[in-house]
Amino acid sequence: MKKPELLAPGGSLEKLKTAIDYGADAVYIGGEMFSLRVAAENFSKEDMQEGIKYAHDRGKKVYLTANILPHNDDIEEFEEFVKDIKNYGFDAVLVADLGLFDMMQELAPEIPIHVSTQANNINYRSAIKWYKMGATRVVLAREMSFKEIAEFQKKIPEDLELEAFIHGAMCISYSGRCLLSNYMTGRDSNMGACAHPCRWNYKLVEETRPGEYMDVFENERGTFIFNSKDLCTIRHIPELVQSGIASLKIEGRVKTSYYVATVVGAYRREIDRYCADPENYVFNEAEYEELCKVSHRPYTTGFYFGKPDENSQVYTSSSYIIDYDLIGIVK
């Protein structure tokens, strides 16, 4: 049994260091462009180099996210960006677009390529095609079950790694295919500027009665039609490890350092405990309680055990649960 990599979000240099200090094996970060997280602090080129050195000095890895779906105007800028960063020492780059994939191979062939979840990786034939083109890892769509992942593993080459999300926010659509934000606000979700209209509360209008807004009820509290709970799999470490997934990924580049420290620490401890003694492993419920101390929505296991039902949605509010405040950092 191989211990999987624990992959953490690094929305800033401080968060990268926090993730590593609390047990991450690798951190994924974004530059000031191309990384699909406009709201994150992101990394200057100087921060990138400092972060990579910090990680490598401790035997850890840093992956660069370049997983936007670019327009023509982005291509020349991306070429210059790659020329600037290709010698920084990134351990891999995440892309979702075929054009950027091709450019990475042309401009920086020494950097391994991981295919982002934005590419909607939900079947093994797609994964095999990415592998034949040169990808070393495929990030699975969040919409896959353990059963589907097991079948996936049987069909793909042994040296093609799989990465999967284990904690964090869930999109209501297949990642990369939602255009609600573009249509309703002009903010492009595929360029990192999603306004999250899936979590808004909606009213109904009859076309001959403009200005009369009627409530839409799923229950007595109203409706949040697309408002998914957050993914949490801390209680299912045995299934995750036994699935053969190479990298277990935590979502949250726009979250706080406190969030990163708490979530990474909890998963680190449980993964280590299970891998040290699988036969006698018993989940420590205190770790779930730790995860409830960070800003979060109610938790769900997502698609891992089958298609979600109505219990995977939040019907009362689109706001986060915030029951605890950070009062200080002990150094």
In which residue ranges do the predicted regions lie?
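Surface-exposed amphipathic alpha-helical tracts and adjacent flexible/coil segments at the periphery
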Residues: 1-21, 26-29, 33, 51-52, ...
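Glycine-rich, positively charged N-terminal anion/phosphate-binding segment
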Residues: 37-54
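Alpha-helix capping/helix-boundary segments
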Residues: 99-100
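Conserved phosphotransfer cores of two-component systems
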Residues: 108
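Active-site PLP-lysine loop of aminotransferase-like
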Residues: 122
